[in-house]
Amino acid sequence: CYNETMSDPLQGDPLDADVTPHDSTISPGATGPGVTTPYLDSLNEAQRAAVEALDGPVLVLAGAGTGKTRVLTTRLAHLLHQGRARPYQILAVTFTNKAAREMRDRVESQIGGAVEGLWLGTFHALGARILRRHAEVVGLRTDFTILDTDDQIRLLKQHLQAENIDEKRWPARALSGLIQRWKDKGLTPEKVSAGNAGDFANGRAVALYADYQERLQTLNAADFGDLLLHCLTVFTEAPD
């Protein structure tokens, strides 16, 4: 499992590291209006316009290799440099740990110092951090374990055996894929419609999904799909 080994791609700490406004610092470079901004010098006119538009949302549409990541990271640095936001007020999401690390490095290079408290990482890493704070909303404790794919399949195999379902005919890996697709769509067992239920184990997939979720809760565990699905539940049921 990933409970102890999986790290936030930017903080370098376990995913359950708690980041609060009190941890949010920028050091040692000076920030605020009037401070020089040499990091803007490498941008072209269109890139600079996107970075300096701080009073509202900006949509950047550009092809590969045109500097979208540079614009995003420089915009983050500019928000901090101009004192328009504290690190803990910024959320930046990427798809890979490598991209997240590179973005953090670029921002710190442009700011001229370490940035602590910035919410920057992959969807799953940030989801895990949010869940550590609000685990009780989904029936977990804050020290819940994050299962990897092998752990998940092992647990499903045990469940199929307990239900006397032929695992050779109905593989646990296939059930795992089905459950993850439902979770990717934001579907809890209660929300899976008859049309989406599939024919796994002669129509028993939804019941197996529900039992699997109950088992995870008993074990105080979550799989990768839960890191996003549970966040959706948290945002819906506890918006404050």
Task: Locate each region found by the language model.
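Pre-Walker A adenine-sensing motif
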Residues: 44-52
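Short hydrophobic/charged patches on amphipathic alpha-helices used for structural packing
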Residues: 48, 239-240
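Conserved NTPase motor "head" modules and their coupling/switch loops across ABC/AAA+ ATPases, GTPases
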Residues: 40-42
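A basic/glycine-biased coupling hinge at the interface between accessory DNA-binding modules
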Residues: 2, 7-38, 55-58, 63-66, ...
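Hydrophobic positions on the alpha1 helix immediately C-terminal to the Walker A/P-loop
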Residues: 71-72
